Amino acid sequence: MADTIQVTPQMLRSTANDIQANMEQAMGIAKGYLANQENVMNPATWSGTGVVASHMTATEITNELNKVLTGGTRLAEGLVQAAALMEGHEADSQTAFQALFGASHGS
């Protein structure tokens, strides 16, 4: 017999919260990196092809992080919506069951 995983609305909401928290942490790390990058790229401190390459890397990190944040936000919002739908369907099913068989059978 295969093991099953029961997914609850609370599990979906908890996962959405974890995604948001991890994205905030990633954003903090990236902002720190980019701030350091801007400090290092000061022309008085550093110049040449290394600055250009480093700037391109920082720009790419920013672009990719924005994609991750957009996707992660959509995912988290979708999980919260799915949790609400699950609860709505469960309530509708319970009401339909009780209407069909009586209130004493559903509890």
UniProtKB/Swiss-Prot annotation:
Localization annotation: Secreted
GO CC terms: extracellular region
Any single Pfam family the record assigns to this protein: WXG100
Cystine connections: none
Keywords assigned: Secreted
Predominant localisation class: secreted
InterPro entries, alphabetized: ESAT-6-like_sf (IPR036689), T7SS_ESAT-6-like (IPR010310)
Superkingdom of this protein's organism: Bacteria
Family designation: Belongs to the WXG100 family. CFP-10 subfamily.
Protein name, as recorded: ESAT-6-like protein EsxD
Record organism: Mycobacterium tuberculosis (strain ATCC 25618 / H37Rv)
Lineage start: Bacteria, Bacillati, Actinomycetota, Actinomycetes, Mycobacteriales
Gene: esxD
